[in-house]
């Protein structure tokens, strides 16, 4: 076996009732979130209602970016960036799987970049800052919650590329 060094600065809170700690994690960074989710399974399972109640009871304001598609689109990322800037969002809260988390990572970097988020593809040196992300992973299929990559799709060029930075863990 070859020697190696492995660094994952991701904090993981897991277990029964762990979701109840969510407001505490959010309040370390601010009192407003962009809640990002996909097709609505979090509503069908009751997770959405539970999270909204936790946010409301903790006086954490929230706006929503719903309908994040598999292979998140650049237009969705841009919409999220605009929402963060217009509403002075402090934390991004993706709830879902890899696509939701990837979209949120791209939003986190894009909201701190003065330009088109697509410019960040292949240019980690351009990512000088990123918004905090506190993810509620509902399925661990892609591992996005444990890596510094965000894969997004540019509908115009038909390209699927990644944005990468240690700031996106």
Where are these regions (language model features)?
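N-terminal amphipathic/basic leader segments beginning at the initiator methionine
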Residues: 1-29
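Glycine-rich phosphate/diphosphate-binding loop of Rossmann-like nucleotide-binding domains
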Residues: 24, 34-54
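Short, high-confidence coil segments that cap the C-terminus of an alpha-helix
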Residues: 30-31, 89
């Amino acid at each position: 076996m070859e020697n190696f060094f492995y660094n994952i600065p991701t904090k993981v809170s897991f277990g029964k009732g762990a979701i109840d700690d969510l407001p505490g994690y959010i309040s370390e960074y601010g009192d407003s979130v962009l809640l990002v989710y996909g097709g609505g399974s979090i509503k069908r399972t009751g997770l959405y209602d539970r999270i909204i109640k936790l946010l409301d009871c903790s006086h954490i304001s929230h706006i929503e970016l719903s309908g994040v598609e598999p292979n998140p689109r650049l237009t969705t990322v841009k919409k999220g960036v605009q929402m963060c800037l217009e509403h002075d969002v402090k934390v991004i809260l993706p709830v879902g799987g890899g696509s939701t988390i990837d979209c949120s990572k791209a939003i986190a970097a894009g909201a701190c970049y003065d330009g088109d988020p697509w410019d960040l593809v292949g240019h980690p040196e351009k990512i000088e800052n990123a918004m905090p992300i506190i993810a509620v992973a509902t399925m661990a299929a892609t591992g996005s919650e444990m890596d510094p990559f965000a894969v997004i799709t540019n509908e115009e060029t038909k390209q699927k590329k990644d944005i990468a930075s240690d700031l996106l863990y």
